[in-house]
UniProtKB/Swiss-Prot annotation:
It holds the Pfam family Stress-antifung. (Microbial infection) Interacts with Grapevine fanleaf virus (GFLV) 2B-MP. Modulates cell-to-cell trafficking. Keywords: Cell junction, Cell membrane, Disulfide bond, Host-virus interaction, Membrane, Repeat, Signal, Transmembrane, Transmembrane helix, Transport. It is a single-pass type I membrane protein. It comes from Arabidopsis thaliana. Residues 25-132, 137-234 form the Gnk2-homologous domain. This is Plasmodesmata-located protein 6. The chain crosses the membrane at residues 257-277. Its main location: membrane. The lineage of its organism: Eukaryota, Viridiplantae, Streptophyta, Embryophyta, Tracheophyta. InterPro entries: Cell2Cell_Antifungal, GNK2, GNK2_sf.
Length: 288
């Protein structure tokens, strides 16, 4: 995932909703370096400064990268970038809200880690102690495919049309394709050149075709780009991508909350009962 010597642990992946309607702060993936920094160190100060710059800049720009230099000769320099999905704007505040959420989650996920990256539905943030800016990285981070749809010539034609439009080199760094009920989206990070972006996207799209060609939907995230396709509003990917899994999870959450509330109520009643019994005993002793 990182183009550095650090080793990353990819956090639990949970892709939810379709790209057009899912909440922009839906968690996609996150990873942190094994290497840690010391609390109170100059590097920690530079990381905090960098992440703060992300949030401030996102109210004006949908992409930016920063280098926070340390003192000459030390190892406290930190490099980072953020990027919002191509259909989000800085003017509406959607980009800034997403980046702020991503920075907050990254701070919790990668506390004291020298490097970290986090992808939400609407934005991506990354920092490291070794520069990765302008470096193409086609490492596979996430690859998920939906259930097979079986042979359907119309469906396959639409899918090929959508994926083909994503592969068009004239599409820029953010690309959208639509055919019937199918839609696709692809994007690479803003630090790549046009040639590097096309190369990265072709790798992601190629994997999407090969690995998810007969699936109802598919997602391939590489370290510096991604490509996805899905039926518009036709499925939910919560916790394993099953169409009804989200409702089941909500039911489980409600059941858990009901149990917790019941336990709290039971404990409260027990405390009241014991208090009443204790007072009754005291009155009984006082009357003797």
């Amino acid at each position: 995932m990182f183009a550095t010597k650090t080793v990353l642990f990819i956090a639990v992946v949970s892709l939810l909703g379709t790209f057009s309607s899912a909440a922009v702060d839906t968690f996609i993936y996150g990873g942190c370096s094994q290497e840690k920094y010391f609390p109170g160190s100059p590097y920690e100060s530079n990381v905090n400064s960098l992440l703060t710059s992300f949030v401030s800049s996102a109210s004006l720009y949908t992409y930016n990268n920063f280098t926070t230099n340390g003192i000459s000769g030390d190892s406290s320099s930190v490099y980072g970038l953020y990027q919002c999905r191509g259909d989000l704007s800085s003017g509406s505040g959607d980009c800034a809200r997403c980046v702020a959420r991503a920075v907050s989650r990254l701070g919790s996920l990668c506390a004291m880690a020298s490097g970290g990256a986090l992808q939400l539905e609407g934005c991506f943030v990354k920092y490291d102690n070794t520069t990765f800016l302008g470096v193409e990285d086609k490492t596979v981070v996430v690859r998920r495919c939906g259930p097979p749809v079986g042979y359907n010539s119309d469906e396959m034609t639409r899918r090929d049309s959508v994926v083909g439009s994503l592969a068009a080199s004239s599409g820029g760094s953010y690309r959208v394709g639509v055919s019937g009920e199918l839609q696709g989206v692809a994007q690479c990070t803003g630090d790549l050149s046009a040639t590097e972006c096309q190369d990265c996207l072709m790798e992601a799209i190629g994997r999407l075709r090969t690995d998810c060609g007969g699936a109802a939907w598919g997602d391939v995230y590489l370290a510096k780009c991604y490509a996805r396709y899905s039926a518009r509003g036709g499925h939910s990917r919560a916790n394993g991508y099953g169409g009804n899994r989200n409702n089941n999870d909500d039911d489980e959450i409600e059941k858990t909350l009901a149990i917790i509330v019941g336990l709290i109520a039971g404990v409260t009643l027990l405390v009241v009962f014991l208090s009443f019994m204790a007072k009754s005993c005291e009155r009984g002793k006082g009357g003797k």
